[in-house]
């Protein structure tokens, strides 16, 4: 009875399972083949680290049933003998746009930017689209799917690659024999982000990287606010953002710096992003490791530059030459340092290029096991799908590759790519390998035939005696077609390759049109020994420096104790200038100032006949920035210059050579209320974060005049358009900030607004204003606005009409940071005079000389000297204008700006009076570490020449060996100013 019940139960189970296939069919008798298929005698990579020899893989219904060396094969199974062949899990691309069309670029443009969103019921910014779902835009692409399968891929994770918040992805099996009901593994497989605007919207904000970062921060804050039910309206974007939080969060960074930026945003919001990198992570490996993020790595290694023309070769920077040489080692370095990563085809022009670049990465030291993990188990784990894809363990999809051998070897042929149990033939595995050397009889004539290349894509070389003849060979479905030309006469032949015989026979069409026969007899089997030796040669990789460009250091400079002996010391303090004086540096601080000091273990520097000063400080700079303006709104107090510090800007090194040790990196003047400043120490070789002053005073850039009212922008749609309007912008925003603070302090729920938080800091005296200014009426206006709201303007920068209102500035307590002798470069500076600095100082204003220019900043010592000529300022007071005075304006004078015991050892040793045009900075020291040394600089120049020649030789060799090259490009570095966009 029990047996009968069991059989009946099995019958009904089978019937119900069959009945679940509810789509009607009109193609004949409805049937389903549930036979097992067994692949025997293969080397099977169950996972990258679990490999069996002479194993069996048993599959049924698109899934792995059993795998190993002791598999019981059911009766009536289809058995395929794979003796001598290998089985691998099919690859996974975690970052794809397969089947998802690119959005159309928004129409319009012209002179009127779009400041508001175009959508209703969604987030206030069109570039935030978490509600997008790739599945709704997905259409299976058979042609592209075949290209991907031919490269070894069985699954791709696709999404809409547009916008800052991009919505969800879709995980697709590349099963061309099924429909979306089967091949869609997950219709919400991840949540995607980037720093790039949507091409489908013309909404102006954000216009910069720092704006995109600020928008992401505010988006997350708003999502939390929305989730708490504190908003009465419906926002489909924020609803989707909150709904998608449980998915893997993937962000496109694109380079090593943006990897760190993305991770910082994630950390602030409790999110561990998986990050699409750029292939240069090896340059800052310790910082990358500290993120604990999983990376997605493109394999788009750069081609060598064609440097055969020595003059064009000058266009190629040492940085680009190094990256060509070092980039293929990136995966190896990440793997050695414990960074988890997946590979992606993103950035490659064709999937067919994957294998060659994988081989290059392996040649550069990446283990084959790590390479396979990056294509299989790691992307599966990252997506949370390790129980269904990425390996050949029991229960997983039957996604696997059949190869002739090691999948990463050049000579290996990919025969088949099975996806969800469906067979896809790439190359016929039963087709004979015909490579080798042959004696060829074509009619009555004899030739030598050599067949090389890959088994599935062979190449022919035909010779008559020693003459090489133009030839073409195709080989498919066991048919070989060969043609060659001798003395402009064409021979064509076709033959069927049979069994294991060493002879190929067939029909021949002679040049005169008559028909004959041919016979090719193999004399030597093909061997890859010579190629193997060549591939075994390890490439020479040049050393990474910090930063990894010209003039970078082999290691980051370290603080050391030092004693400057017998210097002329410019203290920038009441002590004035001290002759024949010693300065002892210990632990990065100025320890003692005096004569005949004992060095102890400190390094002694003979400064006899030389001048020692505090480091030059530039109150107004735009160097070391990746962006300078966020122009999308008339107030952008939420953006931070600290987000876009570029620690690899060569102008940092050049400024160190000019004695500059600190600077304020200011937002530009595109709007009345700009972004927050970054105060930096020019620690060449350090990360951006390590350059920013610890416990830095808070600053923000304001602006007045032509730029903020868009006088020269040819755009008239943004408020303000007049100087009167500029005042009202300030009044409006500060009033809103007051109201915001009242609500915040009330204890009632409030929406955290980064922009308002910044303005509240100004009202409370916690953040200082550096204001771009020219015209006296506007200077006076902003001081009155500040008085109205009860705060002080800290600094007027540029301030070319400061001499007209110097008494009012002194009364208000605001400083002036000005140019020495700039005028006549635009209309609103028509009243500028070179006596401006001296006049403001005479009225009790703290005056600094600034640059607003990457070139002028390294000559600020000479700019300060001009105040002696124009105004009769003393040498000591002139020098204070580029040392202690800017330090006071930046509220860092307790640490830097003068030579005083206890202050940071930010010092410059000059060859002459620092105000002289003949003076050279011989050593520039920051916190006891030497970041510029004139003698070392000379050595570096010679080393750069030698390294360039070495890399050029490597590139020439690459070209000679048939490697692909790219044309040299003259990349001109952009120099930012206040009005740069």
What annotation goes with each model-predicted range?
Residues 21-31, 35, 44, 48-90, ...:
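Histidine-rich, glycine-flanked metal-binding segment
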Residues 140-282, 413, 419, 454, ...:
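Polyanionic/metal-chelating signatures
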Residues 103, 110-123, 131, 298-308, ...:
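His/Asp/Glu-enriched, well-ordered alpha-helical/loop segment
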Residues 25-31, 44-56, 68-69, 352, ...:
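Acidic, glycine-enriched loop/beta-strand segments at the rims
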Residues 54, 159, 232-327, 341-342, ...:
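Active-site core of metal-dependent hydrolases
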Residues 95, 441-448, 479-548:
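Beta-sheet ligand-binding and adhesion/scaffold domains
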